[in-house]
């Protein structure tokens, strides 16, 4: 899978994103990609969006060539792994207030390659 946002950031290019809170249509990824955005921020913390809708939007966004990034509702391993399994290419945890919490959250998502 191509992560357009990551590629642009690593190349020092401008990378534009847009936040999504109210829209529930899978077409939003295509609309935002056509509008010139590189990534889509899907917010599961500040609305009633569930994993099914976030997943559908993430998959459709990838298909449209836009990177889906999801903010999960809380510090829970299963929230992060589920959105990644369902198509998100990045996860944002809310209310990370210190380095120890950040390290713990990173450890949730670190993969050991066998």
Residue ranges and their predicted role:
Residues 28-29, 37-55:
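Glycine-rich, proline-tolerant flexible connector loops at the mouths of alpha/beta enzymes
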Residues 112-114:
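Conserved small/polar residues in nucleotide/adenosyl-binding loops
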